Regions:
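Short conserved segment of the HATPase_c
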Residues: 32, 207-221
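Conserved catalytic submotifs in the C-terminal HATPase_c
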Residues: 81, 117-122, 139, 144-154, ...
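Primarily the dimerization/phosphotransfer
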Residues: 29-71
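Glycine-rich ATP-binding loops of the HATPase_c
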Residues: 248-254
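Short loop/turn elements at sensory-signaling interfaces that couple input to output
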Residues: 1-13
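Short alpha-helical segment of the dimerization/phosphotransfer core of two-component systems
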Residues: 91-96
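Sensory beta-strand/linker motifs that couple input domains to effectors
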Residues: 16
Length: 275
């Protein structure tokens, strides 16, 4: 109801009544739909977390026992072909555990249950460690990794485990989609606004704007990969973006077909640790 005085010199008022029942009904329906969607999302995330944990437990046993047999700790295995099969079992098991860990982390982030151990992180040191870990993969694919790390870079306040995963995911993606003879350049630098930025640039196949949008959706994969045989679950970039944002960092990606890709993760000045 709206009440207003009539401006004709008299002490008269006008009241206008509006029936807002349809609006209230629509509002109630929207709130209920939102509540149901949130409950469904939470239930999905909880289910993914539980199933990932249940699958990972027996997988660890498979990996562990295959490693024992590969090392022939209790005697020779015999035929060389068996040894190769054991290597395949061990490698595939390790890959599956890695995918499950990604799935578990993403489900925790969506449910708001990811635990972060915030501490001062030396971004340069962590980046160098990740480059060393990814160097064998780069060598196999004949891809060159170059680094350009800023000197006297202040530490950032972040969760070291998730930042390490961010760097490893970005390096793995760049190597995966860069042809033999190509380059991956990893750099750190301070920005004028006080933030610290981590950049991973490659000379790979690149993506169109539409493909970038697809790549950032969980479980979506691009059909134009030069490494089709190495496709994963489509969690790499979505998880990396989610981990960056969980650490209060911004995530951006620029790319063009046949012109490579640039990913930037910027930690704001408020996340700088006192030296």
């Amino acid at each position: 109801m709206t009440i207003g005085k009539i401006s004709d010199g008299t002490d008269r008022f006008c009241a206008i009544f509006r029936d807002i029942t349809p609006w209230k009904k629509s509002e109630s329906e929207l709130l209920n739909a939102k509540r149901v969607a949130e409950q469904a999302s939470s239930a999905k995330s909880d289910f993914l977390a539980k199933i990932s944990h249940e699958i990972r437990t027996p997988l660890n046993a498979i990996i562990g026992f295959s490693e024992v047999m590969m090392d022939e700790r209790f005697g020779p295995v015999g035929n060389e072909r068996y040894k190769q099969y054991l290597k395949d079992i061990h490698t595939s098991g390790g890959h599956l555990v890695s995918l499950l860990n990604d799935l578990l982390d993403l489900s925790k982030i969506e449910a708001g249950k990811l635990e972060l151990n915030i501490a001062a992180v030396d971004l340069n040191e962590l980046t160098q460690q990740c480059v060393a870990l990814m160097q064998p993969q780069a060598n196999r694919e004949r891809v060159i990794i170059r680094t350009s790390l800023a000197t006297s870079l202040p530490p950032v306040l972040a969760d070291a485990r998730s930042v390490r995963q961010i760097v490893l995911n970005l390096l793995s993606n760049s190597i995966k989609f860069t042809g033999a003879g190509g380059q991956v350049i990893v750099s750190t630098a301070p920005n004028d606004d006080g933030s610290i930025v981590l950049r991973v640039r490659d000379t790979g196949v690149g993506m169109s704007e539409k493909e970038i949008a697809i790549a950032l959706e969980p479980f979506r994969q691009l059909a134009t990969s030069i490494r089709r045989g190495q496709d994963g679950t489509g969690l790499g970039l979505p998880l990396t973006k989610a981990l960056a944002e969980a650490n209060r960092a911004s995530f951006s990606i620029k790319s063009a077909v046949n012109a490579g890709t640039l990913v930037e993760v910027a930690f704001p000045g408020s996340r700088m640790a006192a030296e």
